[in-house]
Regions:
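N-terminal Rossmann-like dinucleotide-binding module
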Residues: 2-50
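Donor/substrate-binding cores of folate-linked one-carbon enzymes
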Residues: 12-13, 33-36, 90-209
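N-terminal beta-loop-helix "entrance" segment that forms/cooperates
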Residues: 46-64
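Internal anion-binding site segments
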Residues: 2, 204-254
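Short, well-ordered alpha-helical microsegments
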Residues: 23-25, 79-80, 100-102
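Short amphipathic alpha-helix with an adjacent loop that forms part of the alpha/beta core around
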Residues: 77-87, 106
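Short acidic-hydrophobic, aromatic-tinged amphipathic segments that line or gate anion-handling sites
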Residues: 70-75
Length: 254
């Protein structure tokens, strides 16, 4: 099969994995940079809102408007043959929302490249942005790494730090870090694919972890939290899980 050289100089077809709203930042960045996105893998349409209306992920809508094939497997092995039909594909993953099995990882060269919004090995897990705000860190950042079976434990291609001024909200920081990560990915992808940029293993002894958030995380106990701690949670949990506090007989949504 012949390869098409794009304006980016990259010929390997890209399979993009992503589901969340901010996954669209990365997909759009790849497409607008002229990179050869051959397919988008996302979760099946899901019921959302009070009316439980079946809603497509934003990346699916975007891909369809740009004539990019969309794959929505319930299990990734369902698309193995589709991936194998591509000529030496590379994977890019941004908040797909499912664990990628080893057999799927092995279908890609040099693997699946992941954009993670923290300075790994700090904050491995699903809530690094919220954790940085809640803990009132003075900096965070973004990492592009090679995906492995263990959560966020793969070797690192590049990182970019980002200073925090203790005013950031969750939605703002999501947009900022995933835009930063997308720009980093686009700029470094040629060097990654050529082998010029080699990943460096993480120091597992320095790893810290963050958990999946639940609605209960938004409950503010104003008798134990300092004003600064409460304010940080309000900024970190804006949108979901949203913060609430009980004052007297009233529960206030903040």
């Amino acid at each position: 099969m012949s390869k098409t050289i794009t304006s980016s100089g990259i010929s390997q077809p890209i399979v993009f994995f992503g589901t969340e709203e901010h996954s669209l930042i990365a997909l759009r960045g790849l497409v607008e940079a002229g990179l050869p996105v051959a397919a988008v893998v996302t979760k099946p349409d899901a019921a959302k809102g009070r009316g439980k209306k079946l809603t497509a992920p934003a990346v699916k809508v975007y891909a369809e408007t740009h004539n990019i094939p969309v794959w929505q497997p319930t299990r990734l092995k369902e698309i193995t043959e589709d991936i194998q039909k591509l000529d030496n594909p590379v994977g890019v993953l941004v908040s797909y929302g499912k664990i990628i099995p080893k057999k799927t990882l092995e279908l890609f060269t040099p693997g699946i490249i992941n954009v993670h919004p923290s300075l790994l090995p700090k904050y491995r897990g699903p809530s690094p942005i919220e954790s940085a705000i809640v803990n009132r860190d003075n900096k965070t950042g973004v990492t592009i790494m090679c995906l492995v079976s263990a959560m966020d434990a793969g070797p690192i291609y590049q990182q970019v730090p980002y200073a925090l001024d203790f005013t950031e909200t969750k939605p703002e920081l999501y947009d900022t870090l995933f835009t930063l990560g997308t720009n980093l990915l686009v700029s470094k992808l040629p060097a990654i694919l050529s082998g010029e940029l080699q990943p460096i293993p993480q120091n597992d002894s320095e790893a810290t972890y963050c958990a999946l958030l639940s609605k209960e995380d938004g409950n503010l106990d104003l008798t134990t939290l300092t004003p600064g701690e409460a304010e940080a949670r309000v900024r970190a949990y804006l949108g979901y899980p949203r913060t609430r506090a009980t004052i007297g007989n009233h529960t206030i949504i903040i």
